[in-house]
Amino acid sequence: GLVDTLRMAVNPAVRVGDPHAPRFEPPFDPARFPQQRRQLEGMEVTTYTLHPDRTEEDLHYLRQAIALSRRCTPCATSYRVGAVIVTRSGDRFTGYTHETSPTHHAEQEAILKATAAGADLHGASIYSSMEPCSTRSSEPESCSELILRHGFSRTVFALYEPSCFVCCEGAVRLRKGGVEVRVYPQLAGEVRAINGHLGLHE
């Protein structure tokens, strides 16, 4: 959207459920966005930041994901990828390719840990060193499908998946599914270097 900030003022004297009170249905999920509340001349004013600058935070977690990818043993049939999940409540879960199974991708590993812990992933952000996959032969769901099914609101990665194995459409599918996708190509060279075993180089 075109709106970065929405400020809503409510008169405390208006009774909830009053049939004569004006109705307002926000065109977004208020719980997904940072908000500030204050009193101003008898009104309760709430300011929603719809598009906060998250560059510093994104780069912090993306670097963590890249560091995690180094734990994966190089394999001729897989990328070395790391992933970090941050929920709306601040819980964090990590994973990397083949961490617990030779068929698991990094995002899948992190999601499995989160669901096992009973975490609410609706509105969460997932940081992956590489674009989440859109096609899988070894598992019933691709990582992009898992992200959509669990209700993530943001996906952040450094490198679009190269066409070594398949033509990936993960970012396209996520955007079509309503997920915000942010890419930081300034970190892509490091991800390519980590995957040098597949002929990728910085």
Positions of predicted regions on the chain:
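Enzymes that bind and transform nitrogen-containing heteroaromatic metabolites
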Residues: G1-R63, R70, A114, G118
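A polyampholytic, Gly/Pro-enriched intrinsically disordered region
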Residues: F28-E41, R175-Q186, L200-E202
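Short beta-strand scaffold segments in enzyme catalytic cores
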Residues: T46, R80-S89
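Secretory/periplasmic and organellar redox-cofactor proteins
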Residues: L50-E57, I66, A171, R175-V181, ...
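Short helix-to-loop capping/linker segments positioned immediately adjacent to catalytic or ligand/cofactor-binding
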Residues: S69-C75
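Short, basic and Ser/Thr-rich N-terminal targeting/leader segments
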Residues: T77-V81, H104
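Residue-level signal for inorganic ion chemistry
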Residues: D4, A65, G82, C133, ...
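Zn2+-dependent cytidine deaminase-like catalytic core
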Residues: M8, A13-V16, T87-A193
